[in-house]
Structure formats: structure tokens, C-alpha cells
UniProtKB/Swiss-Prot annotation:
Family matches, as InterPro entries: PSII_Ycf12_core-subunit (IPR010284)
Function of the molecule: A core subunit of photosystem II (PSII), probably helps stabilize the reaction center.
Name used for this protein in its record: Photosystem II reaction center protein Psb30
Subunit-structure text: PSII is composed of 1 copy each of membrane proteins PsbA, PsbB, PsbC, PsbD, PsbE, PsbF, PsbH, PsbI, PsbJ, PsbK, PsbL, PsbM, PsbT, PsbX, PsbY, PsbZ, Psb30/Ycf12, peripheral proteins PsbO, CyanoQ (PsbQ), PsbU, PsbV and a large number of cofactors. It forms dimeric complexes.
Keyword line: Membrane, Photosynthesis, Photosystem II, Thylakoid, Transmembrane, Transmembrane helix
Topology relative to the membrane: Single-pass membrane protein
Entry similarity comment: Belongs to the Psb30/Ycf12 family.
Cellular component per GO, a single term: photosystem II
Keyword Secreted: no
Recorded name of the encoding gene: psb30
């Protein structure tokens, strides 16, 4: 049971990083007025 929770937590963190990476880059460019 603990292993499943740990696996889900790792998958969630990986998905969060995958989604947050492009989002952070987009926000940085947006605040600079590049878009």
C-alpha cells in the first residue's frame, strides 16, 4: 500500500514538473513582453 502511494506521488511530481516547466518559461517570456 505504501509502495503504491509512493509510486503515485512520484508520478504526480513528474507530471507536475513536466507541466510546470513550459508554464514557467511561458510566464517568463510573457512578463518580458516577448509574446
Amino acid at each position: 500500500m505504501g509502495f503504491d502511494i509512493h509510486l503515485i506521488a512520484n508520478f504526480g511530481a513528474l507530471a507536475l514538473i513536466t507541466l510546470a516547466g513550459p508554464a514557467v518559461i511561458f510566464i517568463l517570456f510573457y512578463r518580458r513582453g516577448a509574446l
